[in-house]
Amino acid sequence: MAITEPILKEAQERMKKAEAALQRELGNIRAGRANASLLNRISADYYGAQTPLNQMAAITVPEPRVLMVTPFDKSALKEIEKAILASDLGISPANDGSAIRLVIPQLTEERRKELAKDVKAEGERAKVAVRNVRRDAMEALKKGHKDGQFTDDQLHQLEDQAQKLTDQAGKDVDAIVADKEKEILEG
């Protein structure tokens, strides 16, 4: 649907940002498979500065449940290992002198259900964000109507468009959540 009203364009952009934030959050939830994004939030001390691992090392997935972290500078190996141990990943790094192997353990059924619940909670937070965007857009449209920018008919059309945007964003969030739940539960 082509949106011409700036208020609705802004609302659509904010809804897309809520979806992108949800995908980033869900990318950090471990699904029993190796994924380089698991290390996105981890930083290590590198010459006195906290540096993200993906800027200090090549992170590869040689096997479905193994992450390999190969530092560009071998002297940073110990610091990277310390950072991984200090993180909340719950994975013990194996240092072979030139790289670090991280074996992702299989998830228990109980843990899978827990993660699926976390995914649903993140999805719910994203939907709340989308609804807040709709509320802000509706308030701005009503203010525009009050100020004489829109006729009654235009206001109703724009409100319908805002609701359609909200419904679509809700469906998108549901699809993202369903995909992640499937990934977790199938392992």
Swiss-Prot record:
Location relative to the cell: Cytoplasm
Keyword Protein biosynthesis: yes
Main localization category: cytoplasm
Domain of life: Bacteria
BP-aspect Gene Ontology terms: translational termination
Disulfide bonds listed in the record: none
InterPro entries hit by this protein: Ribosome_recyc_fac, Ribosome_recyc_fac_dom, RRF_sf
Keyword tags: Cytoplasm, Protein biosynthesis
Any one Pfam family match given in the protein's UniProt record, by short name: RRF
GO cellular component, one term: cytoplasm
Example of a GO MF term: ribosomal large subunit binding
Described function: Responsible for the release of ribosomes from messenger RNA at the termination of protein biosynthesis. May increase the efficiency of translation by recycling ribosomes from one round of translation to another.
Matches recorded under HAMAP family: RRF
Similarity comment: family membership: Belongs to the RRF family.
NCBIfam families assigned to the protein according to its UniProt record, in alphabetical order: frr
Name of this chain's protein: Ribosome-recycling factor
Organism for this UniProt entry: Lactiplantibacillus plantarum (strain ATCC BAA-793 / NCIMB 8826 / WCFS1)
